[in-house]
From Swiss-Prot:
InterPro entries: Globin (IPR000971), Globin-like_sf (IPR009050), Globin/Proto (IPR012292), Leghaemoglobin-like (IPR001032), Leghaemoglobin_Fe_BS (IPR019824). The modification Phosphoserine is found at S45. This is Leghemoglobin 3. It comes from Lotus japonicus. It is found in: Cytoplasm, Cytosol; Nucleus. Heme b binds at S45, K64, H93, K96.
Length: 147
């Protein structure tokens, strides 16, 4: 079964909820990444000098990751696959020596952040599955661009 319009709607609405508290949710996202994989700190220029804290770079990067995942949901419904609009994403991930386990860490952090952003009453298996599917589509496209 492919990605559904209902899953796209779930990702879209929860993305809007995530954005309502972007500063806090961005810090949470990177805090979870570093809790799972402390060595990932050196992969992000805005984390090298300190841990996650409110900063324009941190917020911009978190918003980009979540927006790309939301866009992946839209593409999966429309055409069944994700095509990167930014061709440099593959090269950047190669330069940072990103490997499969890093994608797993980011997915876990993304899911924990969405869960926190929407709250326990809105979080569901369907919402988790929708975000997982969208992120997996994005990760597949990035890995393909990495060569």
């Amino acid at each position: 079964m492919g990605f559904t319009a209902q899953q796209e709607a779930l990702v879209g609405s929860s993305y809007e909820t995530f954005k309502k508290n972007l500063p806090t949710n961005s810090v949470l996202f990177y805090t979870v990444i570093l809790e799972i994989a402390p060595t990932a700190k050196d992969m992000f220029s805005f984390l090298k000098e300190s841990g996650p804290k409110h900063s324009p770079q941190l917020q911009a990067h978190a918003e980009k990751v979540f927006a790309l995942t939301r866009d992946a949901a839209t593409q999966l419904v429309a055409k069944g696959e994700v095509t990167l609009a930014d061709a440099s994403l593959g090269a950047v991930h190669v330069q940072k020596a990103v490997t499969d386990p890093h994608f797993v860490v980011v997915k876990e952090a993304l899911l924990q952040t969405v869960k926190e952003a929407v709250g326990a009453d809105e979080w569901s298996d369907d919402l988790s599955t929708a975000w997982e599917g969208a992120y997996d589509g994005l990760a597949t496209a990035i890995k393909k661009a990495m060569g």
